[in-house]
From Swiss-Prot:
Keyword Membrane: yes
Protein name from the UniProt record: Uncharacterized protein UL6
Organism field: Human cytomegalovirus (strain Merlin)
Annotated TM spans: 235-255
GO cellular component assignments: host cell membrane; membrane
Similarity section: Belongs to the RL11 family.
Glycosites: N75, N98, N107, N143, N158, N170, N192, N207, N224, N230
Lineage: Viruses, Duplodnaviria, Heunggongvirae, Peploviricota, Herviviricetes
Principal subcellular localization: host cell
Keyword annotations of the record: Glycoprotein, Host membrane, Membrane, Transmembrane, Transmembrane helix
Protein localization: Host membrane
Keyword Signal set for record: no
Length: 280
């Protein structure tokens, strides 16, 4: 059993298309040998539970372990934004891809995954301290700063035209113009023949404190909305796998204890008794 299950587990880790098929193969070959008592906590069942748990954990992980390096990248598109603006990176990956990933190259060559889309589900990596969003064709970065600049990539897997598609974007963030303030001393004549001097501040800028406060509130709303959406997606993904593992474990326990077989035998015995009663 352990040999077949190990082969199936290795096949699962190498195969990124169909995990359900591998799970069925493992369950088909993982049977209790003859002469071994069917017990919930014997060595065979303990090893079986361990392999199934490993399989579930591997299945919950998407194909994010595929290495992406900056070597051999296509010609990257250049995107320039001023600090404080929003940036949109439009990728050419078609909707025919089963999986789409967005990320950024750190330190020039190390890929860091930010977002993964698989079907109707989205998985977002937290901790980047950047308000962003992603879709199948567009990656959004809100209120960019100088630290937001760099090389971003989009990768599609299992596409109809080719197995893997890759595109990259060089985001350049230009700092804002330096705001200057000029103070002019102007005399003011009062009607009671007294002379006083007042300061008149002439600000050579169009930005006001109210406008800056509105931008800050908008940024906070975007970050809070993105964070709540990411938490909801993570809770749904891991909650679904938790429910599936509990149901699967319950079915395995019932089968191992022989409850379905016992219920079937009792029902057949009851039917046979009724048939014999009718014949008599």
């Amino acid at each position: 059993m352990n040999g077949w299950a190990g082969v199936c587990l290795i096949t699962h880790c190498l195969n990124t298309r169909s995990r359900t098929y591998v799970a069925l193969n493992m369950l088909a070959f993982a049977r209790t040998p003859r002469g071994v008592p069917s017990c919930l906590f014997n060595k065979v069942w303990v090893s079986r539970y361990a392999l199934v748990l490993i399989l579930m954990v591997c299945a919950s992980e998407s194909s994010t372990s595929w290495a992406v390096t900056s070597n051999g990248l296509p010609n990257c598109s250049t995107v320039t934004r001023t600090a404080g603006q929003d940036a949109e990176l439009h990728g050419p990956a078609p909707l025919s891809c089963n999986v789409t990933q967005w990320g950024r190259y750190e330190n020039g060559s190390t890929p860091v995954l930010w977002c993964t889309l698989r079907g109707s589900r989205m998985r977002v990596s937290l901790g980047h301290r950047v308000a962003f969003g992603c879709s199948w064709k567009t990656f959004f970065i809100y209120n960019v700063s100088e630290s937001s600049g760099g090389t971003y990539y989009q990768k599609g897997y299992n596409c109809t035209d080719k197995h893997i598609t890759l595109s990259c974007f060089n985001l350049t963030v230009v700092p804002r113009a330096v705001q200057s303030t000029t103070t002019v001393m102007t005399p003011t004549l009062v009607t009671n023949s007294t002379f006083s001097v007042s300061l008149v501040a002439l600000r050579l800028t169009t930005n006001s404190s109210a406008f800056g406060h509105a931008i800050y509130q908008r940024q906070q709303r975007v970050e809070n909305g993105t964070l709540s959406k990411n938490i909801t997606n993570l809770a749904f993904t891991y909650g679904s796998w938790g429910v599936a593992m509990l149901l699967f474990a319950a079915v395995m326990v019932l089968v191992d204890l022989g409850l379905p077989q016992s219920a079937w035998r009792r029902w057949r015995s009851h039917v046979d008794d009724e048939e014999r009663g009718l014949l008599m």
